[in-house]
Regions:
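Sec-dependent N-terminal signal peptides
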Residues: 4-14
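N-terminal carbohydrate-binding/catalytic regions of secreted carbohydrate-active enzymes
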Residues: 25-97
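Extracytoplasmic
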Residues: 280-409, 426
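Active-site groove signature of glycoside hydrolases
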Residues: 91-113, 134-145, 170-179, 202, ...
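Aromatic-rich peripheral "rim/lid" segments of glycoside hydrolase catalytic domains that contact
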Residues: 68-72, 234-291
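Aromatic- and acid-rich polysaccharide-binding/catalytic face
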Residues: 51, 73, 101, 156-210, ...
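C-terminal outer-membrane/trafficking sorting elements
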Residues: 416-424, 428-503
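Active-site clefts of carbohydrate-active enzymes
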Residues: 135-148, 196-224, 243-261
């Protein structure tokens, strides 16, 4: 039940097929003290929550349906089954039931596999009465564990194995897991759970490992970003919920896990949780264009972390030989394209490129002097018009990848200048943004576009610049709501990108 991290550099990608969804069906929160304002704010980005109880917490018990967020009742142990049945009789909007809470822990539900199996038919009867699906007992590795028949159930999968043996005809539609391990350890944990061939709910997770303690909230952010991106994009993960909304100590106290701050407000960690891109399996990157590597279609073995590169949001890393990531692409026309991969690493590596599972070439990656010391690696790629599947396969490990840019060879002659740009004030308080170009020639015609974190354009203005400093009024047409935005300023063969916060 815990994890790890880096510093965040928040520039959001613009690419073909940007996800039109505003919130993930998978994403939820494990928390039992929501206020109306808490739920109103969180409901923009979460689709469900639970509180370890049979019914919603009292402040939102009769109104939560107004927020389009599912409540999922839990039978914490066998005693909780009656309460779940009573609530299911009252609330016709529920879809799922959660089984027992960490029954292999003596300090939690404290039920042996046989005891859990004996109690299960009562929960199953409720599900069948109301046409609901059931999540298995939620398990994890324990310290003080239940024992039965000479077996101490430290291993959660041994517990589930014996539960299923004792309950072989029971209705169990999903596997329930908790996890607090550090780093990318959740990947191997999920891989172990795939053997049951059922969709998975991860109903508690955070980096909270006393053997590998997160030192600060920035490290927790790094863990959250990589883990949520993995869970969001894994097809075997049905739903997940971060632990927890609030703690008594607050976000600046170990283990630094609070999503909520003051009433109705998000912490920085909470905002990051809400902002992780929603997975769209139909998304295609348009070529020519840029592929942000964390937005893969399918992946094996790789893990993401926040990048400190000059642009990008997350990079993929934790590379081992045989790891791979796939991307759906749409190529506008036949041609030989320039390929630029943004690489960082402490050793030389190699990447195989495959198109539609046909090997095309191998790219060698250099030692850049560090995992966040970024450099461009250039090559060429022949592509035909239409839909394709581009696969990156790690031949030799030792590198991170931020993005891959695939551009026309003809356009390479007119190199795009990245303008060194200063934007202030930031945060923006009254809609007025001052832009300063730090370059020899600042004049020309430029198009200013503002995008929200989902890639939706919310502002457009053409400006004729005749000096290094100019102003943009973001509220010129409509008032821009508070939030995080991506400002793009493009001219002939030049561009500038800045992340801004509007208050």
């Amino acid at each position: 039940m815990r994890k790890k991290v880096l510093l965040l550099s928040f520039l959001f990608t613009l690419s073909f097929g940007i996800n039109s969804q505003t919130k993930s069906y998978k994403r939820g929160v494990a928390y039992g003290y929501h206020s109306v304002k808490d739920m109103e704010n969180a409901s923009k980005n979460i689709s469900w929550w639970y509180n370890w109880a049979a019914q919603p917490e009292s402040p939102i018990r009769t109104t939560y349906q107004n927020f389009n967020v599912d409540f999922t009742p839990m039978a914490w142990n066998n005693i909780g089954i009656t309460g779940v049945g009573s609530w299911a009789d009252k609330d016709s909007t529920i879809k799922y039931l959660l089984g027992f809470n960490e029954p292999n822990f003596r300090e939690q539900a404290n039920m042996t596999p046989t005891q859990a199996a004996k109690a299960w038919p009562a929960l199953q009867k409720i599900a069948q009465k109301h046409d609901l699906k059931i999540v298995s007992p939620a398990v994890n590795y324990c310290g003080t564990c239940v024992t039965e028949g000479g077996v101490t159930y430290t291993n959660p999968f041994k517990y589930l194995d014996d539960f299923f043996k004792a309950c072989d005809t029971c209705q169990v539609d999903f596997i329930g897991l908790h996890w607090y391990g550090a780093g990318n350890s959740i990947m191997s944990y999920i891989n172990d759970a795939r053997k049951y061939k059922k969709p998975i709910w991860v109903t508690e997770f955070a980096s909270w490992d006393n053997n590998s303690r997160v030192p600060n909230v920035n490290e927790q952010k790094k863990y959250l970003a990589g883990t949520v991106n993995f869970l969001e994009r894994d097809p075997d993960i049905y739903r997940y919920s971060w632990f927890i909304g609030r703690t008594q100590g607050g976000i600046n106290t170990f283990p630094y896990i609070d999503l909520y701050g003051a009433n109705g407000m998000l912490t920085e960690l909470g905002q990051l949780y809400m902002d992780i891109p929603v997975y769209d399996p139909e998304k295609k990157f348009e070529i020519p264009g840029r592929i942000e590597t964390e937005e893969y279609y399918l992946m094996s073995g790789l893990f993401c972390e926040p990048t400190s590169d000059k642009d990008g949001f997350l990079n993929i890393g934790w590379t081992d030989a045989g790891d791979w990531a796939e991307y759906k692409i749409f190529v506008k026309k036949n041609g030989t394209y320039n390929l630029t991969a943004r690489i960082a690493g402490s050793g030389a590596g190699r990447i195989d490129l495959l198109v539609d599972n046909i090997f095309i070439k191998t790219i060698n990656t250099p030692n850049t002097g560090g995992w966040q010391n970024w450099a461009d690696v250039n090559s060429e790629l022949n592509l035909t018009e239409g839909d394709h599947l581009l696969k990156l396969r790690v031949r030799a490990a030792g590198f991170n990848i931020n993005w891959i840019d695939i551009s026309n060879t003809t356009s390479a002659k007119n190199e795009i200048e990245i303008i060194d740009t200063e934007v202030y004030p930031n945060p923006v308080t009254n809609g007025i943004v001052n832009v300063v170009f730090h370059r020899a020639q600042s004049g020309g015609e430029f198009t200013c576009r503002l995008f929200d974190i989902y890639g939706k354009q919310v502002f457009l203005k053409n400006v004729n610049v005749n000096r290094a400093l100019f102003q943009i009024n973001l509220n010129e047409t409509n008032r821009i709501p508070a939030g995080i935005y991506y400002l793009n300023i493009s001219g002939e063969n030049s561009t500038a990108n800045k992340l801004i916060v509007v208050q």
